[in-house]
Amino acid sequence: MTPEQLKASILQRAMEGKLVPQNPNDEPASELLKRIKAEKEKLISEGKIKRDKKETEIFRGDDGKHYGKFADGSTQEIDVPYDIPDTWEWVRIKSIYWNFGQNKPEKSFRYIDTSSIDRKKNIINYKNLQYLSPEQAPSRARKLVSQNSVLFSTVRPYLKNIAVVRELKEYLIASTAFIVLDTLLNETYLKYYLLSDNFINRVNNKSTGTSYPAINDYNFNLLLIALAHDS
């Protein structure tokens, strides 16, 4: 087993809750999900984000299987990627994040493109970010980011251009090649979940195109994520 394979194996075991013993007294992930929902409601009431009218609730039936409950009240069995501890939850990824949309830059900014990501360390190369005026802004320079936003490149996702916005000393704008995820989840947990081979494989399966395969926001948002009690 190569070092990269070992790293991937350890990461996957962590995402399945198999690295450390699970404490039944830990707060269940359902409580974290409630706090996320409350925060989204707050942002909706403040007019900062829009309500998702097609929100899907996922629950575990008495038979141990997972089901999706849709806005119209109907339910459907859902295939989950793997088993997780009882205190964890499977949710659609759109349920755990929000973003503040897009805007055409009105003042000078630092531009985060996919080439701005150091893929070996999965960090943003802040020193190499272009400083651009509004007139110099590329057409893709539109995504608003916040402190601890997680960036996931939807173009050629197998390259794993994924990072967390750790510094917000200047006005930053990200490329529309990224999905920007703002959340109450631990941003490091989310980053590593998005980096896991299992998740990337699911993204690749939903991507279209040959030279530059990409996944659209709709299909990305329907992907499942395992919500840990301490995530």
Locations of regions flagged by a protein language model:
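Non-catalytic DNA-recognition/assembly elements of restriction-modification systems
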Residues: 6-9, 13, 18, 75-106, ...
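Conserved structured core elements
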Residues: 4, 82, 87-90, 139-142, ...
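Active-site-proximal structural scaffolding
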Residues: 3-4, 8, 12, 86-90, ...
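Extended, domain-scale alpha-helical bundle/helix-rich regions
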Residues: 6-75
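Sequence-specific dsDNA recognition surfaces
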Residues: 73-79, 94-104, 115-147, 165, ...
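A short beta-sheet element
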Residues: 140-143, 147-200, 204-219
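Short helix-capping and inter-helix turn/linker motifs at the boundaries of alpha-helical repeat units
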Residues: 1, 70, 211-215
